Swiss-Prot record:
The keyword Ubl conjugation applies. The lineage of its organism: Eukaryota, Metazoa, Chordata, Craniata, Vertebrata. The gene is AIFM1. Keywords: Acetylation, Apoptosis, Charcot-Marie-Tooth disease, Cytoplasm, Deafness, Disease variant, DNA-binding, Dwarfism, FAD, Flavoprotein, Intellectual disability, Isopeptide bond, Membrane, Mitochondrion, Mitochondrion inner membrane, NAD, Neurodegeneration, Neuropathy, Nucleus, Oxidoreductase, Phosphoprotein, Primary mitochondrial disease, Transit peptide, Ubl conjugation. Changing residue 529 to A: Increases protein dimerization at lower NADH levels. This is Apoptosis-inducing factor 1, mitochondrial. Coiled coil: none annotated. It is an enzyme of class 1 (oxidoreductase). Its cofactor is FAD. The modification Phosphoserine is found at residues 116, 118, 268, 292, 371, 524, 530. It comes from Homo sapiens. Functions both as NADH oxidoreductase and as regulator of apoptosis. In response to apoptotic stimuli, it is released from the mitochondrion intermembrane space into the cytosol and to the nucleus, where it functions as a proapoptotic factor in a caspase-independent pathway. Release into the cytoplasm is mediated upon binding to poly-ADP-ribose chains. The soluble form (AIFsol) found in the nucleus induces 'parthanatos' i.e. caspase-independent fragmentation of chromosomal DNA. Binds to DNA in a sequence-independent manner.
Amino acid sequence: MFRCGGLAAGALKQKLVPLVRTVCVRSPRQRNRLPGNLFQRWHVPLELQMTRQMASSGASGGKIDNSVLVLIVGLSTVGAGAYAYKTMKEDEKRYNERISGLGLTPEQKQKKAALSASEGEEVPQDKAPSHVPFLLIGGGTAAFAAARSIRARDPGARVLIVSEDPELPYMRPPLSKELWFSDDPNVTKTLRFKQWNGKERSIYFQPPSFYVSAQDLPHIENGGVAVLTGKKVVQLDVRDNMVKLNDGSQITYEKCLIATGGTPRSLSAIDRAGAEVKSRTTLFRKIGDFRSLEKISREVKSITIIGGGFLGSELACALGRKARALGTEVIQLFPEKGNMGKILPEYLSNWTMEKVRREGVKVMPNAIVQSVGVSSGKLLIKLKDGRKVETDHIVAAVGLEPNVELAKTGGLEIDSDFGGFRVNAELQARSNIWVAGDAACFYDIKLGRRRVEHHDHAVVSGRLAGENMTGAAKPYWHQSMFWSDLGPDVGYEAIGLVDSSLPTVGVFAKATAQDNPKSATEQSGTGIRSESETESEASEITIPPSTPAVPQAPVQGEDYGKGVIFYLRDKVVVGIVLWNIFNRMPIARKIIKDGEQHEDLNEVAKLFNIHED
């Protein structure tokens, strides 16, 4: 009895050892290549081995061998069936998840995920592929423009965007402009807004159905664009063309774009303050900041905006107009003499400041923050000149710090003057590495080295980087523009080096009812005015011959309805601001591209038809 059992166990061991050896000698890559049929994977080696064993066995062992064979084959068949059933169910579940997710907004997806989590259901996470041809680090405007450019030149391209932001790629300008003027009570959920021309659109570049699953990306025949949201690249290995994510996963690439953007700067006075001050301070940048500030604006009695640049002035006007109905006090303070004092000449900066005040904002120029604390439940801001400001909430809009953490592991150069990754005129930092958007310090072949933090630059540089990643080898020559709207009535577009420290010449005329951002979008059909620009460089425009004349300085207190401001360096126009003049950017671009000296800029201003009714 015991002998027979021992013989049976020994026979079974002899038959299983070759099987284990057959499976184990394979490398992980070879095992992955094995057919998915579990019966084939196990039965064939067993059958061959057992045939050899049975041929040398006596009649007394045949019965046991046959029993063992039947047992093994039966177990293998059952296992294969279970494996096939499990695989089919997983595929069905994955298919249903993809179908049910199509057309959902990020908010609806988040709500669905939260509901699943509350019911104890495991929420599936999109997994990163191990390799992609095109890897884009960052999920902003530059990355999306690059993805679109890559796919335009290579329709079968597989593009992966890795974004730290939980949202799909979206445009930032409406966060401080149109969204605040929406009459939709659910605007923070829908993130849809009416442009100044009354047309409605979403803040997202594309709906969720536009994108493919990241884990399916390598297997899709015609390629596509996938987005991994809520993931951060923490390490860049340029030698092995590999990145590491904050969840530990690794991705190899062939071409890589760094479009990491920037982080809002804070004030040292706020950084030194306690946790309560920081919790009641908004560093405005993302969708989450808009949602949070919109809610806060309806709950507090006073909001103070620190910063007098584009973002600070736009938010001040938006909150000021909104506060009229709520009775909220809106304060704006900054160290310059007037709004946008670093950009506009002093007379226009002062006029802009009065415009902001007419929107119901208490504007405090020449204000330098010394400290911030808490007193009797209020935030107390102390200024260097002794003035004090009490408020319920602070919005800091004091600039952007480029995200350059990857420079350390990637061995990339940071520009000591402008910040950002230092790249050449083709936006390339290293072999197979390009940089675009706010984080790129690039060489402008016309104006020298620069770093620009505007939407249109993100579009232009992202598009160029995408072209060069597919072999175009083009330099950065297209001058990007930027614009700012102080509500639907006053706005301006600018291009080139726009710095109030440069000499300026302004030519103005009386505005008509059509000279405002609202009318501009009615003509162009879009509130994101860079999207309405054509690729033409106004090549047929002829600059009129100059006649010596002395430019007349604008009269203080004048109502600057519309006009052109030229910024000069060595008597050459290097920057232009179009004040309430829209859809004339190709003309301004050509003037800067020509780089000629002009004796009478009044003649040049005629190109913009500012005296037309």
